[in-house]
């Protein structure tokens, strides 16, 4: 970036609409909404969110006027036409690794609110909001309640990958669940993309979310409460406070976290358990890195390997450290588009080496979002997946099918 007294010349990314692909689905007007429609700031949220991939990134060299912002009482000159996050990075503010305590920016979609700071006195996201002349920013938000976009709650009859199968009968409700916005993965067949890419919903504090979940549990008399997404672990402070509130309001209820496991660390898991979470599901998704990259849409091989390795590693840590305190489950994403039966067997061997008693749930990924062309696996196909895993020694295998979930002994729910 070259600076003059009042202008900055910089190379920047901008997103434009590919009119040939746009079908006017209005996803960008109702769910993932631009916060700077008059001037693209290159946050890329709409690029990742468009179901029809009708967004293109172009790079250009531009001149932007310098504007003044105040951060923690100190005045800075930054280029106009960029996000608050980029402006903060340009003046040396550090965004910590995803899953850390403090300021992070793990989703870059506007859903998780982990990047939020006080902007002109209001808690707001830095990743999708444009920097403005005269903006006053405070990085000290320790006394401000965290926020996150939440969908639900709703009662569920089956639950998620770690919902104890012995509680599921297919008739009564087993969990009251919420789904939180934002994710660090870019799965082209995201099964909850309307949640994952939501940056326009009203955010809730942890206590507000806990109160709604507790009310839902009371109405439907569910033995469990679940938090899914999107990816719940992106906003650490919000999630820990949520579980603390839930445990306070529901002292005897099973509290279930459904996570992809990519950014969970041992100390993060310890903090979750201490906060009252006693049911954790981790989804390594695949047995091979190449398959994982296909499923998650993470094209950076080193980043994909980091996420993939961590999800398996944290599953091992959970089993080794908390088998007596936490009900643990593992999840995998099956579709013949990306996974062979040979890889299914490899997954079985890897899980068996950790603990053959570990509950394993295999989801039959269906066509949606950007992979509308794939075919949903048949019931027979999923039963074969189940048989392969059981032949590798696994004791509790559940497969999701179009007719319902099928578990040990081929009991359906």
For every predicted segment, state its role.
Residues 2-14, 93, 129-179, 192-197, ...:
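N-terminal [4Fe-4S]-dependent radical SAM core
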Residues 14, 21-41, 45-61, 114-124, ...:
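Iron-sulfur cluster-binding cysteine motifs and their immediate structural context
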Residues 47, 104-143:
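Glycine-rich phosphate/adenylate-binding loop and adjacent beta-alpha elements
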Residues 208-372:
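Conserved AdoMet/S-adenosylmethionine-binding subsite of the radical SAM
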């Amino acid at each position: 970036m070259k600076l003059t007294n009042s202008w900055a010349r910089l190379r920047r990314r901008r997103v434009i609409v590919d009119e040939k692909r746009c079908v006017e689905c209005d996803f960008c007007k109702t769910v993932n909404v631009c916060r700077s429609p008059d001037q693209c700031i290159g946050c890329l949220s709409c690029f990742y969110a468009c179901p029809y991939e009708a967004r293109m990134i172009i790079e250009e060299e531009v001149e932007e006027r310098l504007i003044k912002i105040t951060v923690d009482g100190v005045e800075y000159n930054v280029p106009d036409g960029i996000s608050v996050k980029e402006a903060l990075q340009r003046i040396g503010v550090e965004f910590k690794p995803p899953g850390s305590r403090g300021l992070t920016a793990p989703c870059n979609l506007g859903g998780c609110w982990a990047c939020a700071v006080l902007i002109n006195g209001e808690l707001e996201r830095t990743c999708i909001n444009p920097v403005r002349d005269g903006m006053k920013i405070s990085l000290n938000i320790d006394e401000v309640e965290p926020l996150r976009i939440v969908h639900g709650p709703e009662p569920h009859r089956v639950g998620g990958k770690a919902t104890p199968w012995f509680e599921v009968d297919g008739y009564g409700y087993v969990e009251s669940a919420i789904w939180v916005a934002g994710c660090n993965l870019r799965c082209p067949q995201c099964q909850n993309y309307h949640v994952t890419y939501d940056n326009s919903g009203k955010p809730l504090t942890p206590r507000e979310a806990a109160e709604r979940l507790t009310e839902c549990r009371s109405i439907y008399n569910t033995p469990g409460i679940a938090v899914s997404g999107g990816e719940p672990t992106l906003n650490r402070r919000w999630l820990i406070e949520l579980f603390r509130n839930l445990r306070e309001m529901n002292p005897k209820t099973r509290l279930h976290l459904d996570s992809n496991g990519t950014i969970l660390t041992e100390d993060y898991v310890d903090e979750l358990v201490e906060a009252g979470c006693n049911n954790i599901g981790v989804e390594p998704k695949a047995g091979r890195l190449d398959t994982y990259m296909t499923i998650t849409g993470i094209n950076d091989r080193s980043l994909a390997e980091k996420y993939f390795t961590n999800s398996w590693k944290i599953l091992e840590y959970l089993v080794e450290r908390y088998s007596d305190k936490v009900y643990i489950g593992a999840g995998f994403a099956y579709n013949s588009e990306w996974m062979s039966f040979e890889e299914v067997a490899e997954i079985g061997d890897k899980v068996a080496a950790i603990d053959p008693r570990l509950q394993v749930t295999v989801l039959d990924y269906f066509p949606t979002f950007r992979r509308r062309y794939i075919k949903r696996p048949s019931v027979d196909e999923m039963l074969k997946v189940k048989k392969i895993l059981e032949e590798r020694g696994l004791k509790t295998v559940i497969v999701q099918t179009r007719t319902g979930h099928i578990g040990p002994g081929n009991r359906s729910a």
